[in-house]
Amino acid sequence: VEQLGKNGQMRIESEEWILQDPPVLLQNFSEEDIRDFLAVGDVEKFTLGDLIMREGESGNSACLLTKGLVSIWKNNIHITNLERGSFIGEMFIFNPSKRIANVVAEEDTVVLRFTRKRTLDFFRKKPERLFKIFIINIVNLQQKKIAAMDEKISQLQQKLLQAEQGTQQR
């Protein structure tokens, strides 16, 4: 893992696309608020196979994927892949509980890591409405993740039923 300084070149490059197409957690933030929020995070670089988050470890931070591709693994089972713009571990703001899955870099990857303490300090210095927007964005992100999980469960249930029917016909 290579960490870059707060004003590293990677940070400047990553901000432009974020400002033009904000990730779900930053939607309805002003451009100034987005820039201020991004300044709270630390840039970290990973290469293929690096573990970004480990299942079971303390979840006192979240990551914004600014470059690359990561895979999510639970009990050695591939759950999904996430691309640039994805937030990982966004529930850290409510409760720094244990990580529920491994997050692995599938290629050269860059994240902005936000600690719970620094993020809460950031929102304490801002108008309360910004924190409320952030919380609504977390709820929206969670809803999208739940909908995606529902779809995956439905597909797996269909495959299971087809497999059972195939076994019964033999």
Where are these regions (language model features)?
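Cytosolic regulatory regions built on CNB/CRP/Popeye-like sensor folds
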Residues: 1-170
